[in-house]
A protein has these predicted regions:
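Low-complexity, disordered linker/stalk regions enriched in Pro/Thr/Ser/Gly
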Residues: 1-210
C-alpha cells in the first residue's frame, strides 16, 4: 500500500500591513505607490506548530472621508508581490495609486488583507475589521501674513522693532477639507545688503530662522 503522508493542518489567517513611513505618520504630500508586506503566520499553540506555504493573494482597499467613510477602491489585487528569499514566507507588495486616491485636502483610510496557500481556498485575513491607516493628503502650502511691522512702515530710535509678529494658516480651509497643520514658521530679515544671521546682518546668503 501507499506509504505515510505528511501534511500541515493550517486554519490560521495570514496578516498584512503597510510599510510606507509617511502613511504610518499620517500626513502625506506624495504617494505614488503604497508598499507593504503580508506574512503567513503559524498559530501560537501548540508549540512548534507549522504554517502553510506562503501567501497566495494580497488586496488593498482605500476609502475617503466625507460625512462618512466612502469606499473609492473596492478590494483590489496589489501588484509585484512574491515570497522573499530565505523561505521566510513574507511577501512584499506595491500598489500604484490613482488620481481619486491622491486629492489634496482629503482624508483616506487604507486597509489590506491577504490569503495564504492552505487548500482548498486558503485562510483569509478579515480586512474589513482592521483599523487600517488614516492619512491626510495635503499638497497645498500654508499661508502666512506679517502683522508687525507693517508694510512700508518707518521706524526710528524712538520706536524700535524688537518683536516680529505674524500669522500662519494651513490652506485651504473649509468644510470637509483636511490639512496637515503648521509644523513650524520661519522668518528671514534683510537690510538691503545682508541677511540677519542671529547676531547681526552678516550673511550675504539667504538665512531662514525659526
Amino acid at each position: 500500500g501507499a506509504g505515510p503522508k505528511t501534511f500541515i493542518w493550517d486554519v490560521t489567517a495570514p496578516t498584512s500591513t503597510v510599510t510606507n513611513t509617511n502613511i504610518v505618520t499620517g500626513y502625506v504630500n506624495s504617494l505614488p505607490t503604497i508598499s507593504g508586506s503580508a506574512e503567513d503566520v503559524a498559530p501560537t499553540t501548540p508549540a512548534g506548530a507549522q504554517k502553510s506555504d506562503g501567501i497566495s493573494d494580497i488586496e488593498i482597499q482605500i476609502s475617503s472621508m466625507g460625512a462618512t467613510w466612502s469606499i473609492i477602491t473596492s478590494w483590489i489585487n496589489v501588484s509585484n508581490f512574491g515570497v522573499q528569499a530565505g523561505g521566510s514566507q513574507i511577501s512584499t507588495f506595491t500598489y500604484t495609486t490613482s488620481a481619486p486616491e491622491t486629492i489634496s485636502g482629503k482624508r483616506y483610510l487604507i486597509k489590506t488583507r491577504s490569503v495564504d496557500n492552505a487548500l482548498p481556498s486558503g485562510n483569509a485575513e478579515n480586512g474589513d475589521t482592521k483599523t487600517g491607516y488614516t492619512i491626510t493628503y495635503d499638497t497645498h502650502p500654508p499661508l502666512n501674513s506679517i502683522v508687525f511691522p507693517s508694510a512700508d512702515g518707518n521706524y526710528g530710535p524712538s520706536y524700535q522693532v524688537t518683536v516680529l509678529s505674524a500669522t500662519a494658516q494651513d490652506y485651504p480651509q473649509g468644510s470637509g477639507i483636511y490639512n496637515a497643520g503648521i509644523q513650524k514658521v520661519q522668518v528671514k530679515i534683510y537690510n538691503t545688503v545682508n541677511y540677519w544671521d542671529g547676531d547681526g546682518f552678516d550673511s550675504a546668503s539667504e538665512v531662514w530662522r525659526d
